[in-house]
């Protein structure tokens, strides 16, 4: 099988009822695009504002268990941390009576680490967008696709890969984007590696730069924030990396910048690599999944403590004042 898919056929989904479970960030966008592509879509959600929004936007909306009962294909588009409980209470009992069913996940996490184990009779697939819902809709309106990872954990029907590719087309990823053949385990590893390594390293480096510049060198908070990220330069660099490549985009910077970046990248590489190796092992052997499950069971004490520590830091307070001055929207205000 080719490792990349640039287009697919919607035929496996035609004549079937597709239940989108969760009408949040991904659910709303995927349901809307599939409906535009002529597929029969219903929505399953708890009775909250998203339930009412789905009704307002013209979908048939049901409680989650009823939506699964009425569906031939279900897309689970709810947060990882609540999915296990929702699956066990609302979905698993319904699946016991299904002879042929397709269960699609947008994340590999729960299946990869054994938190959810669908019946052997169920096609268990993954279509994992590499983009948030808002970004997907922006691209869709421009007639463009976006990247997704595809995986199959169980192929009860012999057609699981066909279903995965068809969903990728149905939700607008292809054509125009790219679907990469992957696995639940691979997606979970890559997703968590980003969240555990370069993202916190970047955030930590920015905070350290701010603290040292302001406290030890007398730099104004405004100047520090604008230099490190608030000006938008960091976002522009990220855009160029996505479009041109991480090293190719360096030609847009001065030679001084290029030299400083390259010399320090190789200088710190061994230290960073050891961090990444340790985190990858911790993820792959299931240790993080256990840590996160215990944190949830305890009521998120570490999470809330660290969130408060971050948002009450001097950098966060200075950022809030600067963004107000610049007329930017400040959330949680």
UniProtKB/Swiss-Prot annotation:
Pathway: Amino-acid biosynthesis; L-isoleucine biosynthesis; L-isoleucine from 2-oxobutanoate: step 2/4; Amino-acid biosynthesis; L-valine biosynthesis; L-valine from pyruvate: step 2/4
Signal sequence region: none
Residue ranges annotated for the KARI C-terminal knotted domain, each copy included: 183-329
Pfam families: KARI_C, KARI_N
The protein's Enzyme Commission number: 1.1.1.86
Molecular function in Gene Ontology: ketol-acid reductoisomerase activity
Keywords, alphabetical: Amino-acid biosynthesis, Branched-chain amino acid biosynthesis, NADP, Oxidoreductase
Start and end residues of each KARI N-terminal Rossmann domain: 1-182
Superkingdom classification of source: Archaea
Enzyme class, spelled out: oxidoreductase
Catalytic activity field: (2R)-2,3-dihydroxy-3-methylbutanoate + NADP(+) = (2S)-2-acetolactate + NADPH + H(+); (2R,3R)-2,3-dihydroxy-3-methylpentanoate + NADP(+) = (S)-2-ethyl-2-hydroxy-3-oxobutanoate + NADPH + H(+)
InterPro entries according to UniProt: 6-PGluconate_DH-like_C_sf, KARI, KARI_C, KARI_N, NAD(P)-bd_dom_sf
GO annotation (BP), single: L-valine biosynthetic process
Family per record: Belongs to the ketol-acid reductoisomerase family.
NCBIfam families (UniProt xref): ilvC
Protein name according to UniProt: Putative ketol-acid reductoisomerase 2
Lineage, highest ranks first: Archaea, Thermoproteota, Thermoprotei, Sulfolobales, Sulfolobaceae
């Amino acid at each position: 099988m080719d490792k990349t898919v640039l287009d697919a056929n919607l035929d496996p989904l035609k004549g079937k009822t597709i239940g989108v479970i969760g009408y949040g960030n991904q659910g709303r966008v995927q349901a809307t695009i599939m409906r535009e592509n002529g597929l029969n879509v219903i929505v399953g959600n708890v009775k909250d504002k998203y339930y009412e929004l789905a009704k307002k936007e013209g979908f048939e909306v049901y409680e989650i268990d009823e939506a699964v009962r009425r569906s031939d294909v279900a897309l689970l588009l709810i947060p990882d941390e609540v999915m296990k409980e929702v699956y066990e209470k609302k979905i698993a009992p319904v699946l016991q009576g299904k002879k042929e069913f397709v269960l699609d996940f947008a994340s590999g996490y729960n299946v990869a680490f054994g938190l959810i184990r669908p019946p052997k009779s169920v096609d268990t697939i993954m279509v994992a967008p590499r983009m948030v819902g808002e970004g997907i809709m922006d691209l869709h309106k421009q007639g463009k696709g976006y990247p997704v990872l595809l995986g199959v954990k169980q192929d009860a029907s012999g057609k699981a890969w066909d279903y995965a590719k068809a969903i990728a087309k149905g939700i607008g990823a292809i054509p125009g984007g790219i679907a990469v053949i992957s696995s639940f385990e691979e997606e979970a590893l890559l997703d968590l590696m980003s969240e555990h390594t370069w993202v916190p390293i970047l955030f930590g480096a920015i905070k350290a730069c701010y603290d040292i510049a302001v406290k030890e060198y007398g730099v104004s908070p405004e100047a520090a924030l604008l230099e490190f990220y608030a000006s938008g330069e960091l976002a522009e660099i990220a855009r160029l990396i996505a479009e041109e490549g991480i090293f190719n985009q360096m030609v847009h910077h001065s030679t001084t910048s290029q030299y400083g970046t390259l010399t320090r990248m190789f200088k710190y590489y061994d230290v960073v690599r050891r961090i990444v190796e340790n985190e990858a092992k911790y993820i792959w052997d299931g240790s993080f999944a256990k840590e996160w499950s215990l944190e949830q069971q305890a009521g998120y004490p570490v999470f809330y403590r660290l969130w408060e520590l971050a948002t009450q830091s001097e950098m966060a307070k200075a950022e809030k004042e600067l963004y107000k001055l610049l007329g930017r929207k400040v959330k949680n205000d």
